[in-house]
Amino acid sequence: MHDEVYLKSNRPYPTKYIIPRKPRSVLAGYSYHITTRCNNREFKLSRRQCREVFLYAIKKVSTKYNFRLYALCIMSNHVHYLIEPLQPEDLPKIMHFLNWYTAMCFNRMLKRTGHFWEKRYYSNGFPSSDKERALNTLRYIHGNPKAAKMQCVAAFSMTLATRVRPISWRSGSL
C-alpha cells in the first residue's frame, strides 16, 4: 500500500528509508586531504583563470580563518587540498567558503547556473605529527596530474610547505 503511494509520487524510495549522513569528524591537531569534484564529473577547471580564482579564494578565506595549506592541486574536474585548520571547527567553514566562492565565480565565468560542485567534499584526516602519512599524501596529490597524463597547462599543483616551517596564513605569507 505505502509503496504504491511513493511510486505515484515519483519519489525514488520511501522517505522512511532515508538515513541521515554521519556528522563529519574533525579533530584538533589533524591535517586533512580534501577532494572536491565538479558536478557530473564535468571538466570545468581547465582554464588558466581557475588557478587565479582558487588562489584569490584561498587568500580571502585566510583573512577569516587560521589554517595551514600544505598542498593544492587543481585538476580539470576536481581539486585536492592538504590543509590543517588550527581550530578544528573551522574546517567546514573554510571549505564552505571555498566551495561557495569558487562555484559563484566559475558559474559566472562559464555563464552557467546550478550546482558547480558535486556532493559535499571528501576528507580524510590524519594526525599532523604523522610525517610519513603527510609525505605519502603530498606524493599522491602531486602525482595526480602525471597519473592522469595531464599537460602542465591543465593541471596546477603547488606545495606551500617546502620551507622549514609550515606557512600560517595569518602571517600574510601569500
Put a short name on every predicted segment:
Residues 1-174:
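Short catalytic/metal-binding and nucleic-acid-binding patches
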